[in-house]
């Protein structure tokens, strides 16, 4: 089998390429952004493309390209089942509800009138989210009905940008203050107050819907579990200081004793039901029981190098280092 790999430095592709070289797997580098990409992969049996939600080009075409090649008979990563809901919290709401999986209660409205009526009838606080964004970007707490109305008015007015300039700056500043970023990173965040990203310039504003989730109090951490081909590993993320969000905090615990096997079991159940090649699942807890917040097919590479082991589907623990990106290649070759 010959694999075509789109190479994006810093992504899964670094380790895919290294693993193919190490194991003597036939591969070629292709450029998914070229108009002739279908021709580029014509002599290959598989195509691998770690597309990113922060690149406007990927948002425009990556899922469509992958699905087209999959329909043409090629093996692809990520395949349609794995990635159609990527960076789409509204899509994930429908998917998890239809699959009967435990999730944080979520609400979506497509008219201002329906949203405002719901606000009058519900309790607060509620968590407001845009359908896209990672690392707690575009996630805010509506403490009161008035705050929720302001989000609704924006969503059905001029809309909201997926890139929050002030939020990005504060994110970098807080990470620097906690030792998780450099001063140069803070300066880059400051520059973004005046210079938007390429994505922000090219992507239209989010409008015409609002999405809320119940706020689950008393969570000092969340658990993220990643499942690839019947193997699972996990991390514990500590909630930010004076905040309710853990994603993107940079405060991570890896010891097996810090992790929760009930989340791992639920993750294996999700993998089985959704037939995904790779899925990262974020959990919070209500009355001691895990609830899914959201999903992703992708994850940052470096933070998981510190994981001390993984589980197999029989819930056996396997101590020691591992290479999840290599698992993805092996899954595609199987």
Residue ranges: model-predicted function:
Residues 1-4:
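Extreme N-terminal starter segment of soluble prokaryotic enzymes
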Residues 8-117, 121-122:
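Conserved N-proximal alpha/beta basic substrate-recognition cap immediately N-terminal to
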Residues 55-57, 135, 300:
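Short glycine-rich, flexible loops that bind phosphorylated cofactors or substrates
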Residues 98-153:
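Hydrophobic alpha-helical segments and helix pairs
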Residues 108, 227-228, 285:
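Generic beta-strand structural signal
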Residues 126, 211, 233-234, 279, ...:
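Protein kinase-like catalytic core scaffold
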Residues 143-262, 266:
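Phosphate-binding site of ATP-dependent enzymes
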Residues 253-258, 272-273, 285-334:
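C-terminal active-site "lid" helix and adjoining low-complexity regulatory extension at the edge
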């Amino acid at each position: 089998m010959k694999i075509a790999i789109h190479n994006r430095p810093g992504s899964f592709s670094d380790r895919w390429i290294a693993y193919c070289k190490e194991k003597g797997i036939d591969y070629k580098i292709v450029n998914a952004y070229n108009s002739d990409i279908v021709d580029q992969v014509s002599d290959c049996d598989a195509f691998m493309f770690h597309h990113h939600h922060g690149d406007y080009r990927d948002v425009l075409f990556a899922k469509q390209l992958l699905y087209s090649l999959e329909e043409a008979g090629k093996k692809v990563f990520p395949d349609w089942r794995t990635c159609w809901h990527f960076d789409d919290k509204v899509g994930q709401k429908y998917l998890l509800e239809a699959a009967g999986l435990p999730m944080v209660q979520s609400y979506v409205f497509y008219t201002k009138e329906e949203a405002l009526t719901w606000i009058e009838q519900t309790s607060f606080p509620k968590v407001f989210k845009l359908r896209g964004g990672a690392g707690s970007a575009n996630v805010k707490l509506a403490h009161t009905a008035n705050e929720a109305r302001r989000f609704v008015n924006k969503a059905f007015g001029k809309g909201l940008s997926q890139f929050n300039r002030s939020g990005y700056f504060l994110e970098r500043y807080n990470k620097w203050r906690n030792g998780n970023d450099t001063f140069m990173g803070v300066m880059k965040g400051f520059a973004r107050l005046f210079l938007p990203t390429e994505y922000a310039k090219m992507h239209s504003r989010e409008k015409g819907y609002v999405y809320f989730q119940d706020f689950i109090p008393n969570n000092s951490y969340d658990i993220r579990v990643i499942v690839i081909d019947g193997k699972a590993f996990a991390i514990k993320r500590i909630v930010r200081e004076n905040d309710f969000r853990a994603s993107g905090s940079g405060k991570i615990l890896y010891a097996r004793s810090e992790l929760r096997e009930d989340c791992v079991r639920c993750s294996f159940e999700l993998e089985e039901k959704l037939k995904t090649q790779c899925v990262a699942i974020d959990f919070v807890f209500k009355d001691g029981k895990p609830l899914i917040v959201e999903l992703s097919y992708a994850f940052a590479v470096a933070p998981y190098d510190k994981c001390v082991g993984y589980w197999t589907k029989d819930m056996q623990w396997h101590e020691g280092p591992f290479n999840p990106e290599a698992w993805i290649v092996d899954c595609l070759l199987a």
